[in-house]
Amino acid sequence: IEKQMQQELQTWMNRYLPFAMLSTRYYLKTLNLPPNEIRATSGLGMPEKYASLFGIQANACISYDPPCPAIHVITCADNGRLNPDLSICQKFADEHGLQFCGDMLGLGIVNLHFSETFDRYYHLWIPVRPTA
């Protein structure tokens, strides 16, 4: 990342960090792959109510994901397993006539054990639609 972008990001984090949390976008095209092949990008996520309060708008560095039907699940990750196993979510979707239809978003809700290893619990949103 270029220096100016790093400074802008640091300023943004300093201003909004109490309202934002670690966020990961897992790309739809990789969600049905084994966990070690799922591709993702991490950053900071903020609930819409806070983004609206601060007048934050989508731009080249900030994306907005509108509300949509989704499977919600809490899962855990650690040093050796950063990507979730979505097989149980896929099974649920299949049993209820649903299919994944968008990038999955994960918001970190708690971190434990900050020594050599860690456990991090995530709230995952997997956008779904009825199977055609």
For each feature predicted by the language model, list its residue ranges.
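A solvent-exposed interaction/effector surface
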Residues: I1-A132
